């Protein structure tokens, strides 16, 4: 019997075939202080551990439910020292399997081949691969040296070319560059056709959040991403949030699965939100 030639596997979309996969250097580093990941160094609140230990085993067999979680997130924001100048509805809060999943969903919902993703350089490394999956063109404006200052005028100029999405990491990972709330709102107001996404994963460490003052009715092209990974120590459970105009949140959530956030993450999130004092102590 003659040998048959191997049959090649089906090709993916051209955008995926050209894509260089994004991977984090995880292997062989457990138990080490991984400063490049900026992980919480003391772990989550004891309330989180207690809630997970009490999680009913029979609930593992059923799909997760999210009743009350959006309300708890909003209540947590309202109770913070900065508060909320404009109330949020539950339709303005999206739940995601970590902020990475939210970033992916934003690009999937809003990016098309040939569209431009505008961002800075260096910045969080997952923005560009997500844009590449959709065939978008990435325009990365370098930070200003010395000091890695935010390239405000260059971003203003680039927005005149009407990019599809502007991704702002504030404060920026890895440079720590900060952009004032006033400048974030200015950029969003100057580019109504551009979705301006503010990744606020580290905002608790600087207090630069736009959430306390933004009116999403006025800045309907602004979307804010948050997580409980860094501050509350839930990185291993993967839960993130998006805040914005209800229509934008709806569009982004349409491209996600109905059960992307698992039940243990939901349980941990409720517990972490109920013990804000623990998180505040860690951040301080």
Residue ranges and their predicted role:
Residues 2-98, 105:
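N-terminal small-domain helix-loop-helix segment of the aminotransferase-like
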Residues 13, 45-49, 63-71, 103, ...:
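A general structural signal for well-ordered alpha-helical segments in protein cores
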Residues 57-189, 202-219, 223:
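Conserved core of the PLP fold type I
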């Amino acid at each position: 019997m003659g040998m048959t030639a191997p049959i090649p596997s089906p090709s993916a979309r051209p955008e995926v075939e050209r894509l260089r996969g994004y991977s984090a250097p995880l292997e062989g580093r457990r138990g080490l202080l991984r400063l490049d990941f900026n992980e919480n160094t003391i772990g989550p609140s004891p309330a989180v551990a207690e809630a997970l230990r009490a999680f009913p085993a029979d609930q593992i067999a059923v799909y997760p439910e999210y009743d009350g979680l959006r309300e708890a997130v909003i209540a947590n924001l309202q109770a913070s020292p900065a508060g909320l100048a404009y109330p949020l509805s539950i339709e303005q809060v999206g739940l995601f399997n970590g902020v990475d999943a939210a970033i992916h969903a934003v690009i999937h919902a809003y990016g098309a081949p040939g569209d431009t993703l505008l961002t800075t350089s260096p910045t969080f490394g997952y923005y560009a691969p997500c844009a590449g999956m959709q065939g978008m063109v990435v325009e990365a404006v370098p930070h200003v040296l010395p000091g890695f200052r935010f390239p405000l005028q260059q971003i203003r100029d680039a927005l005149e070319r009407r990019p599809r999405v502007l991704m702002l990491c504030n404060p920026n990972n890895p440079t720590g560059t900060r952009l004032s709330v006033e400048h974030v709102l200015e950029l969003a107001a100057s580019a109504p056709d551009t979705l301006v996404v503010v990744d606020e994963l580290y905002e608790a460490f600087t207090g630069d959040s736009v959430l306390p003052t933004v009116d999403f009715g006025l800045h309907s092209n602004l979307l804010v991403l948050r997580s409980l990974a860094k501050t509350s120590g839930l990185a291993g459970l993967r839960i993130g949030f998006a805040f914005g105009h209800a229509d934008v949140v709806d569009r982004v959530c349409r491209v996600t699965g109905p059960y992307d956030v698992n039940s243990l993450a939901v349980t941990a999130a409720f517990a972490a939100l109920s013990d804000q004092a623990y998180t505040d102590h860690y951040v301080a």
